Each structure stands twice: as C-alpha cells, then as structure tokens.
C-alpha cells in the first residue's frame, strides 16, 4: 500500500514479465498485491486462483506475501492448506511466518492456536496484550463463541473484502481487539455492513444465551482508506 505513485510502473513491469513468462509465480504474486492495494477484489481473487492452479514452490518471501494476500481476501481455506505444515513445525516457521500465522488464527477465531503461537519459545516477540485477551476469553469460556463470531464476520464481509487488519489496545485496563475490514473500492456498503454485523453478532449472542463481550469490535473502511495508501497519497 505504501507507494501509490509507483503502482503504475510496477504494473507495467509485471505485465512485461508476464507477457514473456505467463506462469511466473513471483510476477503474479506482485500483481496480486497490486490488485489488493487498488481495492480490485474480483481481479485479485482471479489472480490468487490462477497462482493456486499453477502451484509449485516459492521462496519464503513470496509464499508469505501470497498467504497474506489470501487472508486479506478472506480465502481462509486456501491459506490453511499452505499454513498447515508451518503449524506442524513452529521452530522453523515462526521466525519468518509468525505475522501471517497469527493473522490466520485471529481471522479464524482459534483461541487454541493463538495461544499455541504466542506461548511458543520460538515466537519472535512477546504478546502481553494478546495473552490478556486469551486469558479473559478462557475464563469466560468464550472460545467457541469467538470462533463463531469470527466466522460470521468473515461470511458477511467476504464478498467485498480487500484487506483484513487488527489492532490491540489496553487503554481501558484490559485488552480490546479491534478488527479492521477494508472493502473493495467499488463497493459503497461500508456503513451498511457495519450495521449488519452489529445486528447479527447481537442476534448470535442472544441465541447462544451469552452476553456479548465488549472487548471485540469491528471497523469497516474502504480500501482507499488504508492508512498506508492515505499516507502515500499525501506525500
């Protein structure tokens, strides 16, 4: 997202490469990231699926970028196939793949795997705020509800999703998890989706007979409002 002024040049260079080598995975992954940066979900998904069909091995840098792109598009099942061997060998995976692995567990709502990652001696950093979030949800016996709510959010946002981020805050004395969903720039349904999610999350909690946790919130924005894009466009 960081260099909007250079996107056109990047696209032209990538297309020249792909004209010569139509199945060049690295070029296609760069093109995929560009489509996501531009908020062009349909073309991004098509490119992600093209890469999937070609298959083959990738350097860690490009595999990580591809997995992150799949997560930004809400293609969790595809990402899970690539991450499964990483979860089976944390010692080798975490030094490089930790950010996308953690993002995957948060999107999927897996308290179990969030804890497995953050408590691993191979984790590259301490996650004190996330430890607190996990502990609270365990004490509340809220793990399964968290997973169901995350699935509900993804199911309702996926058709327009072009970015999935999160922030952790502890300014209230405990950890809040804020999910940030970036929608395809062609959609103008951000506020509508936000309202739909609030209604459906409340309905789920009511039907499950649980109080809604006030430590999880959702923000919906246009892909054009991604902070890196906004910063770059002002420069």
Please identify what each model-predicted range represents:
Residues 149-153, 189-212:
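Short, non-transmembrane amphipathic alpha-helical segments
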């Amino acid at each position: 997202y960081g260099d909007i002024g250079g996107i056109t040049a990047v696209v032209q260079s990538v297309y020249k490469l792909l004209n010569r080598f139509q199945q060049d995975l690295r070029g296609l992954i760069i093109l995929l990231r560009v489509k996501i940066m531009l908020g062009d979900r349909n073309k991004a998904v098509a490119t992600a699926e093209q890469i999937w069909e070609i298959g083959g091995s990738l350097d860690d840098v490009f595999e990580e970028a591809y997995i992150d792109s799949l997560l930004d598009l809400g293609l969790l099942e595809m990402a899970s196939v690539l991450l499964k061997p990483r979860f089976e060998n944390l010692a080798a995976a975490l030094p490089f793949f930790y950010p996308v692995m953690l993002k995957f567990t948060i999107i999927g709502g897996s308290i179990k795997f969030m804890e497995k990652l953050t408590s691993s001696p191979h984790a590259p950093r301490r996650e004190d705020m996330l430890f607190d979030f996990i502990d609270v949800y365990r004490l509340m016996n809220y793990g399964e509800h968290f997973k169901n709510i995350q699935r509900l959010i993804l199911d309702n946002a996926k058709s327009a999703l072009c970015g999935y981020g999160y922030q952790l805050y502890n300014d209230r004395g405990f950890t809040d998890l804020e999910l940030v969903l970036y929608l395809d720039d062609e959609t103008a349904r951000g506020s509508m989706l936000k309202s739909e999610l609030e209604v459906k999350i409340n309905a789920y909690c009511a039907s499950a007979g649980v109080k809604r946790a006030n430590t999880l919130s959702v923000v919906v924005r246009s892909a054009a409002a991604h902070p890196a894009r906004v910063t770059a466009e002002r420069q």
